[in-house]
Amino acid sequence: MIIRARGFFLLMILLSFQHAIFGAEELKDGLYAKLETSRGEILLQLYHQRVPQTVANFVGLAEATKAWKDPISGKSKKTRFYDGLSFHRVIADFMIQGGDPLGTGSGGPGYRFQDEIHPDLKHSGPGILSMANAGPNTNGSQFFITHKATPWLDGKHSVFGKVIRGMETVNKIQKGDLIQTVSIIRRGKDAK
């Protein structure tokens, strides 16, 4: 009986440890992106049903299923776009920005796509994931995550997700910190 109790106790500890490290089993059905950065992990819920084009672009670049043009060589690539890029623009009490292969704010994937503004998705608080752009319909690969509500960006930038875990990491990010890797997590039949 004692051995069984110890075994059960050990199993519970291992399951708790796995849950603390991975945490993925607690996620509801949906599509998520896990950003592993040089400062820690950020888990984002992606709004794939409300802004499918924007989410598909981000996921395709993250998973190397979407081709992009290297801004230095000019060659087409199908590699994990975000891995190893830096947060090239960080403004305290506003946002962190990444997704530029040049690290200057002027780079992208070699193409642009239309804005996808959903009326229910607003820059309503900290942790909002949105597309950075250079004006209407100039989306590519650059994104930002807010530190606070930024309502003046509504209707100008496509919101496509939110931080559900790791806001403390967002708040620690400094200019030049790295996106080590981006992993996409799918839960449920609708998360394609």
Residue ranges of model-derived segments:
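Cyclophilin-like peptidyl-prolyl cis-trans isomerases
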Residues: 2-3, 12-192
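N-terminal leader/targeting segments
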Residues: 6-8
